[in-house]
C-alpha cells in the first residue's frame, strides 16, 4: 500500500497507527530536521534506520580537477538547505581559489542562491592540505555523507578512504548522479557517523 503523506506527522502515523494508516515495525528513509527528530522520538516504539542530519559533500581534489565541475558539485548539496555542508579538500591553492571564485559566480545565477549562500556561509569550507596524505586524513576524519575523489589517480586514493557514506570516483562521477539514479541508495550516514554506520541495506 502507498500513502501520500510526509513530514513528522507521517512518522507519528506510521509509528503509532491511525484509523487509515496501520502501525509499522520499521521506518526508513531521509527527511528534513523535523522528520529526523520525529524518528528519534518514536525510536523504541518502532525500529528506524538512522537519524540523518543535513546533506553533506566533500570533494577531495588535486590540481587536475576542473574548478567548474567541483564548484557545481559543491553547490548541488549546498542548495538542499541552509544547514547542508559543502567542503573542498585539495592540495592545490590554485584550484581552491578558482573553485571559490566559481562558486561565487554560480550562486548569483541560481534560483536557490539565497539558500546556497547561507549554507556556504555557515557550513562551506575549503581546506588546502600540504600533501595528498594529509588531504586523505582530513576526508577520513570528516567522514562525509558523499565523497567525490577528483584526482589524477582516483582509484589509488580510494584505497585509502576508510570513512564515507558513498564514494564517487573521477570528475564525471558527480554526486547528484548517485542521489537520483546511479547510487545503491539515498539513505547514507551523515555528521561523521560514516565512521561507524553504513548506508541503508537489507
For the regions a language model picked out, list residue spans one by one.
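Short, solvent-exposed amphipathic alpha-helical segments in soluble enzyme
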Residues: 19, 43-45, 73-78, 102-106, ...
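A conserved active-site cap/scaffold subdomain adjacent to cofactor or substrate pockets
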Residues: 50-122, 126
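C-terminal core of ALDH-fold dehydrogenases
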Residues: 141-202
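Conserved NAD(P)+-binding/catalytic subdomain of aldehyde/semialdehyde dehydrogenases
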Residues: 2-85
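Short, well-ordered beta-strand elements within core beta-sheets of diverse protein domains
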Residues: 57-62, 88, 122-130, 143-149, ...
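Short acidic-hydrophobic, aromatic-tinged amphipathic segments that line or gate anion-handling sites
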Residues: 2-6, 126-131
Amino acid at each position: 500500500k502507498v500513502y501520500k503523506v510526509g513530514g513528522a506527522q507521517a512518522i507519528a502515523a506510521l509509528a503509532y497507527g491511525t484509523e487509515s494508516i496501520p502501525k509499522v515495525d520499521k521506518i526508513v528513509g531521509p527527511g528534513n530536521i523535523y522528520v529526523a527528530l520525529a524518528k528519534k522520538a518514536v525510536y523504541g516504539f518502532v525500529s528506524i534506520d538512522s537519524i540523518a542530519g543535513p546533506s553533506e559533500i566533500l570533494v577531495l581534489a588535486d590540481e587536475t580537477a576542473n574548478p567548474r565541475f567541483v564548484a557545481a558539485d559543491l553547490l548541488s548539496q549546498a542548495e538542499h538547505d541552509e544547514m547542508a555542508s559543502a567542503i573542498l579538500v585539495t592540495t592545490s591553492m590554485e584550484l581552491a581559489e578558482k573553485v571559490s571564485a566559481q562558486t561565487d559566480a554560480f550562486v548569483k545565477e541560481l534560483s536557490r542562491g539565497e539558500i546556497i549562500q547561507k549554507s556556504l556561509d555557515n557550513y562551506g569550507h575549503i581546506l588546502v592540505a600540504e600533501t595528498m596524505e594529509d588531504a586523505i586524513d582530513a576526508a577520513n576524519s570528516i567522514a562525509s555523507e558523499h565523497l567525490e575523489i577528483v584526482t589524477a589517480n582516483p582509484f589509488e586514493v580510494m584505497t585509502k578512504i576508510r570513512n564515507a557514506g558513498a564514494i564517487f570516483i573521477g570528475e564525471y562521477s558527480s554526486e547528484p548522479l548517485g542521489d537520483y539514479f546511479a547510487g545503491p541508495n539515498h539513505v547514507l550516514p551523515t555528521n561523521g557517523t560514516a565512521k561507524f554506520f553504513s548506508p541503508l541495506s537489507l
